[in-house]
Swiss-Prot record:
Family the entry assigns: Belongs to the delta endotoxin family.
Taxonomic path: Bacteria, Bacillati, Bacillota, Bacilli, Bacillales
Originating organism: Bacillus thuringiensis subsp. morrisoni
GO BP: sporulation resulting in formation of a cellular spore; symbiont-mediated killing of host cell
UniProt entry keywords in alphabetical sequence: Sporulation, Toxin, Virulence
Pfam families assigned: Cry1Ac_D5, Cry1Ac_dom-VII, Endotoxin_C, Endotoxin_M, Endotoxin_N
UniProt KW Isomerase keyword: no
Gene of this entry: cry1Fb
Protein name stated in the entry: Pesticidal crystal protein Cry1Fb
InterPro entries referenced in this protein's UniProt entry, alphabetically: Cry1Ac-like_dom-VII (IPR048645), Cry_V (IPR041587), Galactose-bd-like_sf (IPR008979), Pest_crys (IPR038979), Pest_crys_dom-III (IPR005638), Pest_crys_dom_I (IPR005639), Pest_crys_N_sf (IPR036716), Pest_cryst_cen_dom_sf (IPR036399)
Amino acid sequence: MKNNIQNQCVPYNCLSNPEVEILSEERSTGRLPLDISLSLTRFLLSEFVPGVGVAFGLFDLIWGFITPSEWSLFLLQIEQLIEQRIETLERNRAITTLRGLADSYEVYLEALREWEENPNNAQLREDVRIRFANTDDALITAINNFTLTSFEIPLLSVYVQAANLHLSLLRDAVSFGQGWGLDIATVNNHYNRLINLIHRYTEHCLDTYNQGLENLRGTNTRQWSRFNQFRRELTLTVLDIVALFPNYDARAYPIQTSSQLTREIYTSSVIEDSPVSANIPNGFNRAEFGVRPPHLMDFMNSLFVTAETVRSQTVWGGHLVSSRNTAGNPINFPIYGVFNPGGAIWIADEDPRPFYRTLSDPVFVRGGFGNPHYVLGLRGVGFQQTGTNHTRTFRNSGTIDSLDEIPPQDNSGAPWNDYSHVLNHVTFVRWPGEIAGSDSWRAPMFSWTHRSADRTNIINPNIITQIPAVKAHNLHSGSTVVRGPGFTGGDLLRRTNTGTFADIRVNITGPLSQRYRVRIRYASTTDLQFFTRINGTSVNQGNFQRTMNRGGNLESGNFRTAGFSTPFSFSNAQSTFTLGTQAFSNQEVYIDRIEFVPAEVTFEAESDLERAQKAVNALFTSTSQLGLKTNVTGYHIDQVSNLVACLSDEFCLDEKRELSEKVKHAKRLSDKRNLLQDPNFRGINRQPDHGWRGSTDITIQGGDDVFKENYVTLPGTFDECYPTYLYQKIDESKLKAYTRYQLRGYIEDSQDLEIYLIRYNSKHEIVNVPGTGSLWPLSVENQIGPCGEPNRCAPHLEWNPDLHCSCRDGEKCVHHSHHFSLDIDVGCTDLNEDLGVWLIFKIKTQDGHARLGNLEFLEEEPLLGEALARVKRAEKKWRDKREKLQLETNIVYKEAKESVDALFVNSQYDRLQADTNIAMIHAADKRVHRIREAYLPELSVIPGVNAAIFEELEGRIFTAYSLYDARNVIKNGNFNNGLLCWNVKGHVDVEEQNNHRSVLVVPEWEAEVSQEVRVCPGRGYILRVTAYKEGYGEGCVTIHEVDNNTDELKFSSNCEKEQVYPGNTVACNDYNKNHGANACSSRNGGYDESYESNSSIPADYAPVYEEEAYTDGQRGNPCEFNRGHTPLPAGYVTAELEYFPETDTVWVEIGETEGTFIVDSVELLLMEE
């Protein structure tokens, strides 16, 4: 008998399937907990305002409304989802506990209401304190009971209700505790408990939720249906409430706060109402594939659906979704399923009213007799829009109502007005296509978002506005959207390196004069800087602390809400807010949300004006404003200017203009008395003989809210002989005789910053200044304005006219002060000598750094009394040492010049003597470097009194090196360029010795280094090698041609110099000492002795600028003394041989027989004809 292949349509509610019956029971029993939870979420989102209203609202909504039988439904909801029943005893105990909490809370509210009506009544204050304490104790006990082992998951929905009540109670104590008569210490204790319990309750809810969800993970679609229902319903009953716990922080949110939930939940009538699910292969993962990955929030704008016929059944076959982001820009998605544009049914297109409800008509089609396979699909669906009862349909409406799964937030009104969620997106899962003999299903999956997530990111002027970071409209490169941890109400933005997170389009409903402060809720594995921009203009920049360890979990306690103290205002009603981060790499930074907090500053205008007037008047010596006070620095004037600029135009425009003119006058007076060239750092190294000179790694940066003008940043250095430096010379023509001058400025932060003032002596300070945030809360965050100008209107900004740090009578400055100053005394002035004053800022350590500005060098006072006598003594001592130095220099210069001249053939210095070798050049160079005071010992780039004669001789030394290198036909014979030009076999190294020489190290007998050299046949060459042998065996340097004509230089550890043998010689006999000395005397003479001390130079010679009264220690510069070539360490031997090639090519080979062979240099020099 043939099988009946006629398809049979089986209504979804007529199957004898116990699992479907359970699902129906879950919907009926789970509706009340969903209704109550959604109402609570609506209340927390909209009614969370200061006052006792929250407490009374919670009682009216939940604790005074829910009966014991209804509390039982909360327990039953999760019991059915996880198929775990709570024992009757524990169920009754939990319900009794909940009822007891409601009674205790009601008594507390009665006392709170009576106190509110008569807050000065002592008895009522005591009553509310007692009843608060009783309810607090009851909640602590109850919440512990709701964590009963093995029953944490079914008790979770009542746990979160009790936790929410406890946080609300503690918030009352923080807000009203002092009014109840609690001391401030007790109030602070309650506040600390509140913050700690927010994190503890959050973590318990998340851990329990994740455990329950993971327990439901399975393999088939039936298991996915239960998994998704648990995820959806506990998001509504637990996670959404937990996401609002941080708003109970009464000190962070003292006014009404607007929050948004951006997470998505899913429904699919095809899967969740299917009577056949377990037999679909890998159905769980296929259904989960319909859940969208993390993304920036979007809003469905249009939906087109096409039908598909599967085994004679017409079902939803595919669709096309178009959305818009929060900036209104369109987003087009790939086609879902099979899409036929010609047969598309228009569901929504450019309609601002979203769908709040679907009425689905799923179909489950089973084959004929003997055919167990099914076709599952959606035969039709109706979509109902908000604000109206109008329905748009795909083919027809059905009876599966999404409101049964996601109820309205208020059942008392029309659902199109009191809906809780809107349809945000539609995805599609499909299995497996047209394959005979298998199940086939087409399942649209509806994604829903909470109605609190508005499309336009509205910022209200009178409340705190929280905007989730995923509501950005533009994600910058390097930023990603990641799945939220569950307690943030949505997903997060993440970066692992410096850059911009995203751009957020915001809409301002209040006046543009309203000012705001920005806060960021973030988690980070590193200290970092956040910066913000509005419409491309910088607004804020500030340092923020690490909140978690790298690799740690995203827990509630790892998130921190912190912000910028300086307020700002928007210039346009519709603006783009940009958030970025810097100063870190290879770490993790997560952004949850941005908060805009109104800055109520109008009441401060009067006190601001009074403060600014006082500060301006304190700048001048008299009311006539003819002169500045001596202790008024340029930095002080800039800060007073900030005070004036921050005055309200609406309140005191005329006074502001008047004060601004006075401050400008003060600034001009300050500039006039400042003897520095370019004090505002317009450039460095712009003019050879004027202004600032500095190392190339110094940067000039525009003013921020620490500096109003430009400032410089000096980084650290890896070599103290090459420090980071900045200097300037004050010309003699600007100085007055017998006068004290002062260098002063402001240091934002520094480490190992050295400051010098040099004339007869060296005044020296090493200044370590911690960052501005560690001393007082100077703002370091904000730059704002239509032209990018900094906004320095921080409310904590203070200017103290008495704040100074000046050195008096030779006393040094106090270290670690942001304000610094150094004094220096000038004696007799001489324009011809032009001694002047050198100002030097230097850093010579790797960890050193400095940011400084507002530098001034100004006349302080004439010298009198002891100060006058001291500078005269210093001047005389300096002149005596100057004369002594001149005599010494004459001797050293003569010797050095003779040594240099002896290198060359004539006074044109264009040819070397035939017997000039590298040792002789080194010796001459060392003598040149004995000339003292060629450069200042404090900074070797500044020329000293002997700079001219030193540079004259040093130039000739460089010429000698160049001529010598040109004469050596072996390339890179000193290994300064590593192994360039050398052929290597085996393992060898080039090492830099502590005398700054590079040497070739041959550590193995099988290694060989060679070079092919082009020569002139018939001409004579000298092969000269300086080397050192360690251990047994011999080191050999061989020169040969293709066939024969081989010579060798051999080195061993037990002979100073080796005998030279013809190529056929196989023995190595030692030189005697006399033979070795004589063999090299013609070309090495003077090498060793050239480094001996010259008896004509005093051994205790000291730099001439040293003055004990002013300088600690001598001003010697070890880097200066180390200049020039240093001798080789003991043990190195120089040997040479004469070689006459017969062809135009020779090979030079370096090797050894055992031990280690170290070669300093290899030279092949053409003999003079």
